[in-house]
């Protein structure tokens, strides 16, 4: 079953447009949504959540999103939360009347696990604690789909690792879907099963993370040698001392050129090459 199905999505702004022809999000997977600032990541997530009007077709759990859909969806979107003078108890009171399946015991268990101070107002919480509270609030009605927009942005490595670990616990049973945008690609690599790369409002790449890392590699060579490698060269970039090429079909390339050394390409390497490469 597909958790999300997108067809011919178009959202136009004055100086930008998002145009996604087809995108299907499988059930029970973690998907890392990557792209440069302004690429359209937040716009895509807000369209899925029906926070923007758009052209095209988006189905969540096989139907157009409606009020009852949010019983099965949890979301963390920047600059969208409760009144900053609220305390944790006030947040709980609102969540109890918002979601039929809200689990107050689970909420406080998670809050205690994160050592959340119950007596502080939201505007007195640290950035890390506020993000933890947002994530707890998003999952304590047991949603099947969790949408997170930059949940680890601006946080120190220890807090980010706590949040990633918490998300791992949430998905361990295998039936939850997470769509998770971040510009911190090391976080994406830790948790994602699939990578979705958006560039200038267009879907550039969508594949399993492990498959991507196996398919692509980086070759350091001279500019003169580039012509020898034909269609294996996807993108190139040059610096003062050498030319680097993003190679596709690495295993086949090594069979043709066994003496060439191809370095592993991580998700960040692939994104940078595809967005800025010279070829």
Regions found by a protein language model. Give the residues of each.
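ABC transporter nucleotide-binding domain
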Residues: 164-247
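Conserved ABC transporter NBD signature motif
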Residues: 56-69
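The feature captures the beta-strand-to-loop junction immediately N-terminal to the Walker
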Residues: 31-36
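Catalytic Walker B motif of ABC-type/P-loop ATPase nucleotide-binding domains
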Residues: 146-150
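C-terminal coupling/interaction segments
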Residues: 233-279
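Conserved beta-strand
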Residues: 6-9, 16-26, 56
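ABC-family P-loop ATPase nucleotide-binding domains
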Residues: 75-134
């Amino acid at each position: 079953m597909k958790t999300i199905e997108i067809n011919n999505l178009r959202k136009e702004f004055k100086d930008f447009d998002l145009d996604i022809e087809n995108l299907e999000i499988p059930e029970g997977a973690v998907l890392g949504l990557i792209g440069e600032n302004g690429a359209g990541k937040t716009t895509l997530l807000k369209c899925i959540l029906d926070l923007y009007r758009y052209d095209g077709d988006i189905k969540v759990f096989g139907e157009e999103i409606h009020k009852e859909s949010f019983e099965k969806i949890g979301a963390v979107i920047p600059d969208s939360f409760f009144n900053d003078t609220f305390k944790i108890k006030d947040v709980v009171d609102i969540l109890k009347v918002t979601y039929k399946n809200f689990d107050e015991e689970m909420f406080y268990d998670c809050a205690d696990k994160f050592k959340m101070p119950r007596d502080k107002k939201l505007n007195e919480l640290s950035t890390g604690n506020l993000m933890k509270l947002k994530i707890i609030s998003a999952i304590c009605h047991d949603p099947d789909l969790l949408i997170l927009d930059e949940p680890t942005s601006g946080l120190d490595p220890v807090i980010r690792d706590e949040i990633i670990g918490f998300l791992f616990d949430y998905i361990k049973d295998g039936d939850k879907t997470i769509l998770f945008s971040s510009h911190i690609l090391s976080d994406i690599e830790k948790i994602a099963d699939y990578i979705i790369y958006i560039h200038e409002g267009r879907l550039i790449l969508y594949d399993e993370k492990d498959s991507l890392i196996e398919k692509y590699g980086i070759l350091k060579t001279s500019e003169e040698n580039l012509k020898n490698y034909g269609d294996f060269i996807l993108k190139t970039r040059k610096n003062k001392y050498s030319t680097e090429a993003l190679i596709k079909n690495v295993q086949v390339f090594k069979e043709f050129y066994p003496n060439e050394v191809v370095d592993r390409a991580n998700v960040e390497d692939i994104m940078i090459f595809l967005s800025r490469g010279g070829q």
